[in-house]
Amino acid sequence: MDLCQKNETDLENGENNEIQSTEETEPTCTCPDGRSEKNHVCCLLDISDITLEQDVKAEEFIIGTGWEEAVQGWGRTSPAACIWPRKLPKKARVGEGACSDCLVCLNLAHRSLETKPPTEGGPEKDQSSPSQTQAAPQGPSTASRAISNICFPTYFRTEKKSLQIKEFIWCTEDWAISDSSRGKALRNPSGGAHRGLSIPGPLTSRALLVLPPLKASLSNALDVLGKKSKNSFLQSEEKVLSVEKDGCLACAYGLKTADGKGEKRPSELAKHTVVNDTPSSPSPAARTSLLTDPEQCCLHWSLLSEKNLACPSDSSNVRYLAALQLLQKRGVQNYKSKFQAKDPRPPVITQKAKQENSPQMLETKVFTRPLLPSLTHRKKKIK
């Protein structure tokens, strides 16, 4: 029992000794004045003071205007450096002073020119202007006079205008005249060709510069019509030839082939030209009004077709168009008689006859309705 108690007491003493040794080995902050406990608090207070000063400076910098920072270094430059533009010096023109690039001088020159009323004597004003500018600045010292003579330009020219402004003014004047002439034409609708031609020539020539060029001659327009009609006729012929034979077509239309080669004559081409839409030849008064009124030409030019341009003036052209219309009417009648003669017949009882008649039904249906083929379904019986 005694041995156990001694061992326990020895263990407790050893633990106490270890605790004391660890407390002694802990680092302690020592101050030169000998204040070890207050050293940590003093360091924290110093850090807080430094951060406070920095925060105050930052707030002052944000709230302040920054004028002091901007003014730093101004003593090294000239006092008028902020007024002068940063550009290369240009050569002085005739009639301008040496300091024409100075903004203050230019503004003062503009104001002096605006306040002075314009006079008729051009060269006299130029000669008198240097003496006026020299006599204007009267100061106690000669330096101010010399500065005024150098800085202020003697004469500033403002007579130049850009080309765009001139063109715009010219166009507005022309259109104003054309509007007035149009109003006169509307008030007098019964006026003939002589009234339409009373508008001066230069106005019409200027107005027609805006329009696209007219065709050179009427024969060219008729050639264009002939080419269009030929193309449409060839397309229709190709569609019809894919259904029926050439010989039956020639007999039904009443056409004849030259030399048996299938070449169509001009009379045959004339049958299928579309001439119903061609207007009658307008009067010369209408032509002159179209040419003399520039606004109508500009607004409605895109609506005019090539058929309107092809206005036949000679009697031979009128006869040619009338003959084309008659030939077209005859061709339509031949079409009608052909389709009435080829009505579908009642089908035959045999199956072969039904198969032979089915493509004929297709042909008649294609042409009686608008040019779209109708679909048919053939049923085959399984034997």
Curated annotation (Swiss-Prot):
Residue ranges, compositional bias (Acidic residues): 10-26
Record field: compositional bias (Low complexity): 128-141
Highest taxon listed in the record's lineage: Eukaryota
Residue spans of biased composition, Basic and acidic residues class: 262-271
Sequence segments annotated as region (Disordered): 1-30, 114-144, 262-289, 341-360
InterPro entries documented for this protein: DUF4529
Pfam hit, one: DUF4529
Name assigned to this protein: Uncharacterized protein C16orf46 homolog
Organism: Macaca fascicularis (Crab-eating macaque)
